Amino acid sequence: MQPIRLGLVGYGKIAQDQHVPAINANPAFTLVSVATQGKPCPGVENFQSLGELLENGPPVDAIAFCTPPQGRFALVQQALAAGKHVLVEKPPCATLGKAALWIKREQASAPCSPCIAYAPAIAAARDWLATRTLQSVQIDWKEDVRKWHPGQAWIWQPGLGVFDPGINALSIVTHLLPLPLFVESAELRVPSNCQSPIAASIKMSDPRLLDVRAEFDFDHGHDELWSIQIRCAEGTLRLDNGGALLSIDGVRQTVAEEGEYAAVYRHFQQLIGDKTSDVDVQPLRLVADSFFVGSRVSVEAFYD
Protein backbone atom coordinates (compact mmCIF):
# COMPACT_ATOMS: atom_id res chain seq x y z
CA MET A 1 0.00 0.00 0.00
CA GLN A 2 1.36 3.39 -0.98
CA PRO A 3 1.93 5.89 1.86
CA ILE A 4 -0.42 8.84 2.24
CA ARG A 5 1.18 11.86 0.56
CA LEU A 6 0.97 14.72 3.03
CA GLY A 7 1.31 18.47 2.69
CA LEU A 8 1.90 20.68 5.74
CA VAL A 9 0.59 24.25 6.02
CA GLY A 10 2.58 26.27 8.56
CA TYR A 11 6.07 25.45 9.79
CA GLY A 12 6.36 27.08 13.20
CA LYS A 13 7.54 25.66 16.51
CA ILE A 14 4.77 23.07 16.95
CA ALA A 15 5.15 21.86 13.38
CA GLN A 16 8.91 21.54 13.75
CA ASP A 17 8.91 20.00 17.24
CA GLN A 18 5.83 17.75 17.02
CA HIS A 19 4.22 17.30 13.62
CA VAL A 20 7.24 16.63 11.41
CA PRO A 21 8.87 14.08 13.77
CA ALA A 22 5.52 12.26 14.15
CA ILE A 23 4.99 12.22 10.38
CA ASN A 24 8.50 10.96 9.69
CA ALA A 25 8.09 8.20 12.29
CA ASN A 26 4.88 6.89 10.72
CA PRO A 27 5.45 4.80 7.57
CA ALA A 28 1.82 5.33 6.56
CA PHE A 29 2.67 8.96 5.68
CA THR A 30 5.26 10.67 3.54
CA LEU A 31 5.75 14.43 3.85
CA VAL A 32 6.10 15.79 0.33
CA SER A 33 5.54 19.55 0.62
CA VAL A 34 5.21 22.46 3.05
CA ALA A 35 3.53 25.85 2.68
CA THR A 36 5.29 28.42 4.84
CA GLN A 37 6.24 32.07 4.72
CA GLY A 38 8.97 31.51 7.29
CA LYS A 39 11.99 29.21 7.35
CA PRO A 40 11.74 26.33 4.86
CA CYS A 41 11.36 22.71 5.88
CA PRO A 42 14.43 20.74 4.79
CA GLY A 43 14.09 17.72 2.53
CA VAL A 44 10.76 18.63 0.90
CA GLU A 45 9.41 21.16 -1.56
CA ASN A 46 8.42 24.48 0.03
CA PHE A 47 5.81 26.96 -1.18
CA GLN A 48 4.58 30.40 -0.12
CA SER A 49 0.90 29.45 0.09
CA LEU A 50 -1.52 26.54 0.13
CA GLY A 51 -2.78 27.56 -3.29
CA GLU A 52 0.73 27.39 -4.72
CA LEU A 53 1.30 24.03 -3.02
CA LEU A 54 -1.88 22.57 -4.50
CA GLU A 55 -1.32 24.03 -7.97
CA ASN A 56 2.41 23.61 -8.46
CA GLY A 57 3.55 21.07 -5.89
CA PRO A 58 3.72 17.28 -6.03
CA PRO A 59 0.37 15.48 -5.65
CA VAL A 60 -0.92 15.25 -2.06
CA ASP A 61 -3.68 13.16 -0.52
CA ALA A 62 -3.97 15.06 2.76
CA ILE A 63 -3.17 18.42 4.32
CA ALA A 64 -2.20 19.03 7.96
CA PHE A 65 -2.72 22.59 9.22
CA CYS A 66 -0.36 24.09 11.81
CA THR A 67 -1.47 27.71 11.43
CA PRO A 68 -3.18 30.08 13.92
CA PRO A 69 -6.99 29.65 14.04
CA GLN A 70 -7.59 33.15 12.66
CA GLY A 71 -7.68 32.82 8.89
CA ARG A 72 -7.50 29.02 9.00
CA PHE A 73 -11.11 28.43 7.99
CA ALA A 74 -10.66 29.65 4.41
CA LEU A 75 -7.55 27.52 4.01
CA VAL A 76 -9.27 24.39 5.28
CA GLN A 77 -12.23 25.04 2.99
CA GLN A 78 -9.78 25.38 0.10
CA ALA A 79 -8.21 22.02 0.92
CA LEU A 80 -11.59 20.30 1.34
CA ALA A 81 -12.79 21.75 -1.97
CA ALA A 82 -9.70 20.23 -3.58
CA GLY A 83 -10.75 16.82 -2.23
CA LYS A 84 -7.98 16.52 0.37
CA HIS A 85 -8.16 14.84 3.75
CA VAL A 86 -7.61 17.47 6.45
CA LEU A 87 -6.00 17.43 9.89
CA VAL A 88 -6.51 20.60 11.93
CA GLU A 89 -4.74 21.68 15.12
CA LYS A 90 -6.98 22.73 17.98
CA PRO A 91 -8.81 25.01 18.12
CA PRO A 92 -10.12 23.97 14.71
CA CYS A 93 -11.11 27.53 13.74
CA ALA A 94 -11.86 30.92 15.26
CA THR A 95 -15.64 30.68 15.70
CA LEU A 96 -18.33 28.11 16.45
CA GLY A 97 -20.30 29.17 13.39
CA LYS A 98 -17.47 28.14 11.10
CA ALA A 99 -16.92 24.89 12.99
CA ALA A 100 -20.63 24.07 12.55
CA LEU A 101 -20.09 23.87 8.80
CA TRP A 102 -17.48 21.17 9.35
CA ILE A 103 -19.93 19.19 11.46
CA LYS A 104 -22.33 19.28 8.52
CA ARG A 105 -19.49 18.11 6.30
CA GLU A 106 -18.82 15.29 8.75
CA GLN A 107 -22.39 14.11 8.27
CA ALA A 108 -21.61 13.96 4.58
CA SER A 109 -18.46 11.92 5.36
CA ALA A 110 -16.07 14.77 4.57
CA PRO A 111 -12.57 13.94 5.85
CA CYS A 112 -12.01 16.68 8.44
CA SER A 113 -10.33 15.77 11.73
CA PRO A 114 -9.32 18.31 14.40
CA CYS A 115 -6.79 17.04 16.93
CA ILE A 116 -8.30 16.04 20.29
CA ALA A 117 -6.87 14.45 23.41
CA TYR A 118 -4.21 11.89 22.48
CA ALA A 119 -1.70 12.29 25.29
CA PRO A 120 -0.35 8.90 26.47
CA ALA A 121 -2.31 8.53 29.72
CA ILE A 122 -5.71 9.66 28.45
CA ALA A 123 -7.07 6.26 27.39
CA ALA A 124 -6.08 4.65 30.70
CA ALA A 125 -7.58 7.54 32.65
CA ARG A 126 -10.84 7.34 30.73
CA ASP A 127 -11.12 3.59 31.36
CA TRP A 128 -10.55 4.07 35.11
CA LEU A 129 -13.09 6.88 35.36
CA ALA A 130 -15.78 4.94 33.49
CA THR A 131 -16.77 2.97 36.60
CA ARG A 132 -16.18 5.68 39.22
CA THR A 133 -18.46 8.21 40.90
CA LEU A 134 -17.21 11.68 39.97
CA GLN A 135 -17.09 14.37 42.66
CA SER A 136 -14.97 17.28 41.39
CA VAL A 137 -12.40 18.30 38.78
CA GLN A 138 -9.53 20.76 39.18
CA ILE A 139 -7.57 21.92 36.11
CA ASP A 140 -4.29 23.82 36.44
CA TRP A 141 -2.81 24.78 33.06
CA LYS A 142 0.05 27.21 33.50
CA GLU A 143 3.06 28.02 31.34
CA ASP A 144 5.29 30.84 30.13
CA VAL A 145 4.15 32.47 26.90
CA ARG A 146 7.66 33.88 26.43
CA LYS A 147 9.01 30.33 26.28
CA TRP A 148 6.38 28.74 24.06
CA HIS A 149 5.40 31.65 21.82
CA PRO A 150 8.33 34.09 21.83
CA GLY A 151 7.61 37.20 19.79
CA GLN A 152 4.41 35.74 18.32
CA ALA A 153 1.97 38.65 18.36
CA TRP A 154 -0.87 36.56 16.89
CA ILE A 155 -1.25 34.77 20.23
CA TRP A 156 -2.85 37.93 21.68
CA GLN A 157 -5.50 38.31 18.99
CA PRO A 158 -9.15 38.20 20.16
CA GLY A 159 -10.26 34.77 21.35
CA LEU A 160 -6.78 33.48 22.12
CA GLY A 161 -4.31 34.49 24.82
CA VAL A 162 -4.16 31.90 27.60
CA PHE A 163 -6.96 29.95 25.91
CA ASP A 164 -4.55 28.90 23.16
CA PRO A 165 -2.93 26.37 25.54
CA GLY A 166 -6.01 26.21 27.77
CA ILE A 167 -8.12 24.58 25.07
CA ASN A 168 -5.75 21.61 25.28
CA ALA A 169 -6.84 21.04 28.88
CA LEU A 170 -10.48 21.44 27.90
CA SER A 171 -10.00 18.90 25.10
CA ILE A 172 -8.68 16.36 27.59
CA VAL A 173 -11.37 16.96 30.21
CA THR A 174 -14.27 16.84 27.77
CA HIS A 175 -12.81 13.61 26.35
CA LEU A 176 -12.63 12.08 29.85
CA LEU A 177 -16.00 13.09 31.25
CA PRO A 178 -19.21 11.30 30.25
CA LEU A 179 -21.48 14.37 30.07
CA PRO A 180 -21.11 17.75 28.34
CA LEU A 181 -19.73 20.68 30.33
CA PHE A 182 -21.14 24.19 30.63
CA VAL A 183 -19.47 27.40 31.76
CA GLU A 184 -21.07 28.87 34.89
CA SER A 185 -18.74 31.84 35.36
CA ALA A 186 -15.28 33.07 34.43
CA GLU A 187 -12.81 35.82 35.29
CA LEU A 188 -10.54 36.84 32.43
CA ARG A 189 -7.44 38.84 33.36
CA VAL A 190 -6.42 40.88 30.33
CA PRO A 191 -3.21 42.95 30.06
CA SER A 192 -3.97 46.60 29.40
CA ASN A 193 -2.16 46.45 26.05
CA CYS A 194 -3.62 43.13 24.80
CA GLN A 195 -6.88 41.88 23.35
CA SER A 196 -6.97 38.50 25.12
CA PRO A 197 -6.42 37.24 28.68
CA ILE A 198 -3.08 36.28 30.14
CA ALA A 199 -4.87 34.34 32.90
CA ALA A 200 -8.35 33.00 33.56
CA SER A 201 -10.38 31.34 36.31
CA ILE A 202 -13.34 29.31 35.08
CA LYS A 203 -16.15 27.52 36.90
CA MET A 204 -17.95 24.80 34.94
CA SER A 205 -20.48 22.06 35.60
CA ASP A 206 -22.35 19.26 33.85
CA PRO A 207 -26.05 18.30 33.94
CA ARG A 208 -25.40 16.46 37.23
CA LEU A 209 -23.82 19.62 38.72
CA LEU A 210 -20.29 18.20 38.82
CA ASP A 211 -17.96 20.92 40.14
CA VAL A 212 -15.25 21.65 37.55
CA ARG A 213 -12.73 24.47 38.10
CA ALA A 214 -9.94 25.64 35.82
CA GLU A 215 -7.00 27.97 36.42
CA PHE A 216 -5.14 29.11 33.30
CA ASP A 217 -1.96 31.22 33.46
CA PHE A 218 0.25 32.36 30.57
CA ASP A 219 2.83 34.09 32.80
CA HIS A 220 3.65 31.21 35.13
CA GLY A 221 7.42 31.06 34.85
CA HIS A 222 9.76 28.59 33.21
CA ASP A 223 8.41 25.37 34.81
CA GLU A 224 5.08 24.36 33.30
CA LEU A 225 2.15 23.08 35.35
CA TRP A 226 -0.20 21.07 33.16
CA SER A 227 -2.31 19.02 35.57
CA ILE A 228 -5.87 17.72 35.89
CA GLN A 229 -7.10 16.24 39.17
CA ILE A 230 -10.39 14.33 39.29
CA ARG A 231 -11.76 13.36 42.69
CA CYS A 232 -14.07 10.35 42.82
CA ALA A 233 -15.79 8.53 45.66
CA GLU A 234 -13.40 5.63 45.03
CA GLY A 235 -10.16 7.65 44.84
CA THR A 236 -8.35 10.51 43.11
CA LEU A 237 -6.97 10.47 39.58
CA ARG A 238 -4.33 12.97 38.50
CA LEU A 239 -2.85 13.70 35.10
CA ASP A 240 0.42 15.62 34.85
CA ASN A 241 2.71 16.87 32.08
CA GLY A 242 -0.26 17.59 29.86
CA GLY A 243 -1.63 14.06 30.12
CA ALA A 244 1.65 12.19 29.76
CA LEU A 245 1.68 10.99 33.39
CA LEU A 246 -1.13 9.27 35.30
CA SER A 247 -1.39 8.78 39.06
CA ILE A 248 -4.18 7.21 41.11
CA ASP A 249 -4.23 8.00 44.82
CA GLY A 250 -0.66 9.26 44.45
CA VAL A 251 0.65 6.06 42.82
CA ARG A 252 2.14 6.45 39.35
CA GLN A 253 0.51 4.21 36.74
CA THR A 254 2.07 2.57 33.70
CA VAL A 255 0.80 4.13 30.46
CA ALA A 256 1.47 3.76 26.76
CA GLU A 257 4.75 5.25 25.58
CA GLU A 258 3.29 6.56 22.32
CA GLY A 259 3.49 10.36 22.14
CA GLU A 260 0.46 12.58 21.60
CA TYR A 261 1.23 13.55 18.01
CA ALA A 262 2.19 10.01 17.06
CA ALA A 263 -1.27 8.96 18.26
CA VAL A 264 -2.88 11.86 16.39
CA TYR A 265 -1.38 10.75 13.08
CA ARG A 266 -2.22 7.11 13.75
CA HIS A 267 -5.83 8.19 14.31
CA PHE A 268 -5.73 10.36 11.17
CA GLN A 269 -4.49 7.36 9.18
CA GLN A 270 -7.41 5.29 10.50
CA LEU A 271 -9.95 8.00 9.63
CA ILE A 272 -8.61 8.22 6.09
CA GLY A 273 -8.79 4.45 5.71
CA ASP A 274 -12.33 4.33 7.09
CA LYS A 275 -13.40 7.40 5.08
CA THR A 276 -14.86 9.01 8.17
CA SER A 277 -14.33 12.14 10.28
CA ASP A 278 -13.78 13.26 13.86
CA VAL A 279 -15.02 16.78 14.57
CA ASP A 280 -15.31 17.83 18.23
CA VAL A 281 -16.33 21.43 18.94
CA GLN A 282 -17.08 21.15 22.67
CA PRO A 283 -13.67 22.57 23.77
CA LEU A 284 -14.12 25.54 21.40
CA ARG A 285 -17.65 26.07 22.75
CA LEU A 286 -16.31 26.23 26.31
CA VAL A 287 -13.75 28.83 25.25
CA ALA A 288 -16.43 30.86 23.49
CA ASP A 289 -18.76 30.63 26.50
CA SER A 290 -15.95 31.75 28.81
CA PHE A 291 -15.61 34.94 26.77
CA PHE A 292 -19.39 35.28 26.61
CA VAL A 293 -20.12 35.09 30.36
CA GLY A 294 -16.71 36.00 31.79
CA SER A 295 -15.95 39.21 33.62
CA ARG A 296 -12.96 41.12 32.25
CA VAL A 297 -10.33 42.39 34.69
CA SER A 298 -7.61 44.70 33.39
CA VAL A 299 -4.10 43.87 34.63
CA GLU A 300 -0.66 45.34 34.02
CA ALA A 301 0.63 45.55 30.47
CA PHE A 302 2.48 42.57 29.00
CA TYR A 303 5.77 42.91 27.14
CA ASP A 304 7.51 39.96 25.52
UniProtKB/Swiss-Prot annotation:
Q: How does activity depend on pH?
A: Optimum pH is between 9.1 and 9.5.
Recorded GO molecular functions are: galactose 1-dehydrogenase activity; nucleotide binding
- Pfam families in the record: GFO_IDH_MocA
This entry carries the following GO cellular component terms, namely:
cytoplasm
The chemistry this enzyme catalyses reads: D-galactose + NAD(+) = D-galactono-1,4-lactone + NADH + H(+)
Single GO biological process annotation from the record: galactose metabolic process
- Return the EC number: 1.1.1.48
Query: Which superkingdom does the taxonomy of this entry point to?
Result: Bacteria
Subcellular location per UniProt equals: Cytoplasm
Which segments of the protein form a coiled coil according to its record?
none
InterPro entries hit by this protein: Gfo/Idh/MocA-like_OxRdtase_N, Gfo/Idh/MocA_oxidoreduct, NAD(P)-bd_dom_sf
Key words, A-Z = Carbohydrate metabolism, Cytoplasm, Galactose metabolism, NAD, Oxidoreductase
The pathway to which it is assigned is: Carbohydrate metabolism; galactose metabolism
**What's its job?**
Catalyzes the dehydrogenation of D-galactose by either NAD(+) or NADP(+). Oxidizes following sugars in decreasing order: D-fucose > D-galactose > L-arabinose > 2-deoxy-D-galactose >> 4-deoxy-D-galactose > 2-deoxy-2-amino-D-galactose.
Q: How does it assemble?
A: Homodimer.
Q: Which family does it belong to?
A: Belongs to the Gfo/Idh/MocA family.
What is the protein name given in its UniProt record? Galactose 1-dehydrogenase
Organism the protein comes from: Pseudomonas fluorescens
